[in-house]
Amino acid sequence: MEAKDHIERRPDRVSIRRLKLVNFRNYAELSLPLGPGHVVLTGENGSGKTNLIEAISFLSPGRGLRRAAYDDVARANAEGGFAIHAALDCMIYGDAEIGTGTAGGGEGGRKVRINGIAASADDLLDYARILWVVPSMDGLFTGGASDRRRFLDRMVLAIDTAHGKRVLDYEKAMRSRNRLLNDGSNDDQWLDAIENQMAELGTAIAAARAQAMRLIAAMIERLPAEGPFPKADCFLEGALESRIGVEAALDLEEDFRRTLRDGRARDRAAGRTLDGPHRTDLIVQHRPKSMPAALCSTGEQKALLIGLILAHARLTAELSGMAPILLLDEIAAHLDMGRRAALFGILDELGGQAFMTGTDRALFDALAGDAQFFNVSAGQLTGI
């Protein structure tokens, strides 16, 4: 996972050429042919714009940009679950048919099929990297550490496809440890085995996060000093992450293992595990103002977040060879004319497909001729 000093070739565009939805949110059935360029969705609030890009976010691992329970995603009063199908096009692999959905009724998780063959959600990363900016992220820098940690891990996942499984396996092991401690178990051998797994996975998680932050920082350094979006300085606040690169990984692993073993009584009393990468926080600073992001104005925080995600999108394209698909929900309304123009220019420079939503079509007039425009009303799309 190393960034090059320059982009040797333009990353390949990954584009959704056809999107089909069945019983997804307010879409009973939708079949939408698309060109390779950007897509703009306009319409009133509640019409289904965000629902559509949420469906696209399910073409990546996880629970989508809303992190919703699958039963909540299926259309109300519809039998069964939901289905999403996308025809993708990319020069790296040619055409690909991606399907995902649920059976409904609480029957298992969502299933994934790629070119008709059952696959895992992590396999989706071989075909597309999907990044997003949504209004719920506006409080990222002022909210709880768990939201920033989740944001951090999604950034890592886009450039290190094994990261998601590490995190899931670590959390599963931690839940097992917590359950044993809460049940009053004194099975030291079983606890040792779980803590060994947590130490190995936790150290690997910390190393992947630290590496990703180093690569993102290097990418930010390569961007123009006076760009349209302020540069961010990012730091990891975590016992393991702060020691990555300073101490040997095996020493960190052993130290974390010892911390877990010595902390059993304390963790039993607390009802949870108090040390580990599940406590890490992402600290972001507004570089031009030398100010913590949490203390910046709402507008400055939004610009800082957009700049960080665009830098991450560049890095993702460079490392994967695929320009990411970007989902930008209500983003133009928060930017002045200069920054909107700059954003549209950067999207073209990235070379990927972007889906943008908004209530005011005029904010996207600069994209006329370069994007497909659709009006969304009650789950129905009309080309405009």
UniProtKB/Swiss-Prot annotation:
GO terms for cellular component: cytoplasm. Gene3D superfamilies: P-loop containing nucleotide triphosphate hydrolases, RecF/RecN/SMC, N-terminal domain. Keywords: ATP-binding, Cytoplasm, DNA damage, DNA repair, DNA replication, DNA-binding, Nucleotide-binding, SOS response. It is found in: Cytoplasm. Pfam families: SMC_N (PF02463). Its main location: cytoplasm. InterPro entries: AAA+_ATPase, DNA-binding_RecF, DNA-binding_RecF_CS, P-loop_NTPase, RecF/RecN/SMC_N, RecF_2. Disulfide bonds: none annotated. It comes from the Bacteria. One of its GO terms (molecular function) is ATP hydrolysis activity. This is DNA replication and repair protein RecF. It comes from Brucella suis biovar 1 (strain 1330).
